[in-house]
Regions:
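C-terminal glycine/acidic-rich active-site capping loop/insertion
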Residues: 137, 225-234, 242, 246-247, ...
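Hydrophobic residues in well-ordered beta-strands that form the structural core
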Residues: 107, 132-134, 163, 255, ...
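N-terminal Rossmann-like dinucleotide-binding module
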Residues: 1-61
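Short active-site oxyanion
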Residues: 41-45, 80-82, 189-190
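Conserved SAM-binding strand-loop segment of SAM-dependent methyltransferases
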Residues: 64-70
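Predominantly a Rossmann-like dinucleotide-binding segment in NAD(P)-dependent oxidoreductases
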Residues: 19, 138-235, 376
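C-terminal helix-rich "cap/oligomerization" subdomain common to oxidoreductases
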Residues: 1-5, 35, 81, 296-297, ...
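Beta-strand-loop-alpha-helix segment that lines the small-molecule cofactor/substrate pocket
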Residues: 81, 87-139, 154
Length: 384
């Protein structure tokens, strides 16, 4: 899709933490896409109650002003597009108010704290003409997009099974203070919402819809954490999640997600095995993926091949200042591609592939996993 007519799109970012800064970086570089030629992206406002942080982020990424509260941008008709990077318990009312004000929005995953909250936001979005999307950024990596195309094109035959993991050690230290991420009411869930939602989306991106959660086990390793009041507080959500899935197309999959993975600051991996081959991806080597096809070569010479994406890969040319094969793309470029997709959707008046409806489906998979863990039985994923 090429954008022909000149247009100015004024954007704002709500939340100046790490995710909000990634959004700001994405907006700042979104104009690199050839398909957005003629579009001027105006970096308007960074919103955060921590005004010093907001000013630092605005200065760093080139935004014109700051605001302490989202109410300061709601009635500004010049601001068309707003990205939101807030804790789960804050994001739902903010996204709802922005949609009601006629803004196009992109929120961070997860979409709310439950399938019910996600459905509420879908209903609000359906009453508007706004683009309403969620930032599942890993699917914007060229290597992941190429891997997905290979599976969908039959390069490994019929998919039989897959496994994915997302490991981090940000919660490994038991002296780390109690925060909203460790509270079930505020977060909706622990690593299952914070991290496993990324792997669920990646697997569905490659294999299609999850049909059933076969089993789920949740575990809290560090059960209490110190609070600002000098007392220790109970951790009420999961540090580790193990999930077994069956896809509507028949493939099986397993997910391991943990925030107490010692020595793994961030490690995401994806593997799909089919009737004639397999694919593998590891985020710590973001600019490559592995393809094995058993019909290429004789036994002993039919080893897996390392594929290095280049300009033919989706998102590569639009995000790379030196778009030559072998130059590495990484997580920063994924956020650039994400914001480019958002702006394309706004200009075209079309939904993104990671729309609220798509993100609500991810939340229904999470709901099924939570029910499976609680009831110790398989749970079919609910339909919308």
């Amino acid at each position: 899709m090429n954008v022909k007519s000149a247009r100015t799109i004024r954007v704002a970012v709500v939340g100046a933490g790490p995710a909000g800064q990634a959004h700001a970086f994405g907006f700042r570089n979104a104009g690199m896409a050839d398909a957005l030629a003629g579009i001027e992206v105006v970096l308007d406002t960074v919103v955060d109650p921590d005004t010093a942080l907001a000013e630092t982020v605005a200065r760093r990424y080139g935004f014109a002003r700051t605001a302490a509260d989202v109410s300061e941008i709601l009635d500004n008709p010049e601001i068309e597009v707003v990205s939101v990077a807030l804790p789960s318990f804050l994001s739902v009312p903010v996204l709802g108010s922005l949609l009601r004000a006629g803004k196009h929005v992109l929120g961070e995953k997860p979409l709310g704290r439950s399938g019910a909250e996600a459905a509420e936001l879908v209903e609000i979005a359906d009453r508007t003409e706004s683009v309403a999307a969620v930032g599942f950024s890993y699917r914007r990596l060229p290597a992941v997009a190429q891997l997905r195309d290979a599976v969908r094109d039959g390069s490994i035959g019929t998919p039989y099974f897959a496994r994915a993991h997302f490991l981090s050690d940000y919660a490994l230290d038991p002296s780390s203070p109690m925060a909203w991420r460790f509270d079930r009411e505020a977060s909706g869930g622990g690593t299952i919402l914070d991290m496993a939602t990324h792997t669920i989306d990646a697997l569905e991106y490659v294999l299609g819809d999850v049909g059933e959660v076969l089993a789920c086990t949740l575990d809290t390793t560090i059960t209490r954490r110190p609070g600002e009041d000098g007392q220790t507080h109970e951790v009420t959500n999961d540090d580790t999640a193990l999930i077994s899935l069956r896809f509507a197309g028949g493939a099986l999959a397993s997910i391991l997600s943990s925030r107490v993975g010692a020595g793994c600051p961030i490690e995401l991996g994806l593997e799909v095995f089919g009737s004639t081959g397999h694919v593998r991806y590891a985020f710590n080597r973001p600019n490559e993926w592995i393809l094995y096809q058993k019909d290429l070569g004789e036994p002993g010479t039919d080893a897996p091949r390392t594929i290095i994406p280049g300009p033919s890969a989706r998102y590569f040319t639009d995000t790379m200042p030196m778009a030559a094969r072998g130059n590495a793309t990484g997580y920063g470029e994924a956020f650039v591609a994400q914001m480019q997709e958002l702006l394309r959707a706004v200009v075209a008046g079309e939904p993104m592939d990671t729309s609220f409806k798509a993100a609500a489906r991810t939340m229904r998979v999470v709901d099924a996993a939570l029910a499976s863990a609680s009831e110790r039985r398989p749970v079919v994923v609910a339909r919308a």
